[in-house]
Amino acid sequence: TVDFEEKVCRADKNCHNECKLKIYRFGDRKSIWGGDCGRYEARHLEGQSQENYFKEREKIFQDYLFQGENILELKQEASSGAPVIGVPMALHSLEWAIFWAHIFSNLGYQVRLTPPTDQRMVSLGLKAMTAETCFPVKVFHGHVSYLLHKADYLFLPNPINIPTPVKEERGVFCPMVESSQYLVRAALDLPDQKLIRPNIFLREGPKDAVIRLQEALPVELRPKGRELDRAVHAAWQQQMDFRQALLQRGRQILQEHDPEQPLWVVSGRPYNLYDDRLNLKLGRHLAKLGIKALPQDFLHYEQETLEDFPRMYWGLGSRILRVAKMIARNPNWYGVHLTNFSCGPDSFLEHFYAYVLRHKPALILELDEHSAVAGILTRIEAYNNVVKNLQQYQYGAAPETVAEEKLVQAG
């Protein structure tokens, strides 16, 4: 006999997704479906677990982020009469929030951050949209909407570019990230007097940021003398220290790794790579499946050259191609690229990514708000079989199946 029931998942008290589970019982066996996170669907695939380096990257990020004295999560109450500056933890903030938050913390203001993306924020973002965009931009709208009445000011910069290893590179963000402040301001009808919205050229370093912030800060928030200069430079150093901590840990991981064993290297844009809702907890699933997977931030990709791509002006695109070159050069490294539907730059970049890898297979996971964990796990399982066959073939064992060396395209 088959018994069936439905109930709301309560496995994680901190999860607000309210997933409606479908539970089937076949005698002594039980099968559970319907969860957004894949907690139940992945169980039959699990092997000897590996370290979750996505979680480790998040811990390092949080450690550096919350070293400021006045940086609050949303549930914390403001502790003084100082103005509260809201920073939405989406898009560029998934990498640069340390810099953003510490500027205002160093000035003595309180900084309120949004919590990790959940279904409530996704719903708020979708409701606020006035045009079709990629999923990360929709989520950004949700974070801003969630924060709107919980801070005195909202910090919504227009980040134009990022630091580049070579001064000739332009390193620009995609237009959606550059203009995210304009999009959300129009969609939510935000009052100008509540916004701090400087144009920030991160490629130019902290000196330029001081000038831009001085122009953008409301008069009542502008510090006297060189206070802003000191605050920005200290915040910049904190951001750079975070990068160095990742590189140091990455070197340690690679030194301990057996070079004859496969290593999956996961590339992508920080705002989907390090948001558990956008990546569907990819790091956790890979670790539970026994797959050693390293996100790109642990790699010293800056040392790679892009002389064969002289006109690559996307900053994050250049980073992804540098990571691809490292994957191509190391025999037992395998590439996983995480992207989104409706991502204009990635629609071009994926071809260059495959070109750089040449003979190596890669897994491209293309996600949006409609993606489900079960489909992603199927793609991962298929790609894992390809990797195993290639490893067997490379080290002399007869593979179960001769794997075609082609790009595994996620549907």
Predicted regions and their residues:
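An N-terminal assembly and electron-transfer interface module characteristic of large anaerobic redox
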Residues: 1-411
